[in-house]
Amino acid sequence: MIVVNLDVMMAKRKVSLTDLAERVDLTPANLSILKTGKARAVRFSTLERICKELDCQPADIIEYKEGDVYE
């Protein structure tokens, strides 16, 4: 399963959802969907903007863990 750790990186960088959404040109609602792991996909361009703003790597935000999301 894919795990989204965006909330962890945002907390480490002390960035609010609203601030990050504005800085990466997303609506707060869409960023919230990504943050909670409910997004079905993410564009590389969006991931790139988030990584740039949070000064991190994609693997800091998204990781793969063994197991099925539906277990």
Label the predicted regions.
Residues 15-33:
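Short alpha-helical DNA-recognition segment
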Residues 8, 33, 40, 62-71:
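Short, charged recognition helix plus adjacent turn
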Residues 1-16:
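A short, Lys/Arg-rich alpha-helix, primarily the initiator
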Residues 38-49:
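Short, basic-rich loop-to-helix N-cap that marks the start of a DNA-contacting helix
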Residues 10, 21, 51:
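The alpha-helix within a helix-turn-helix
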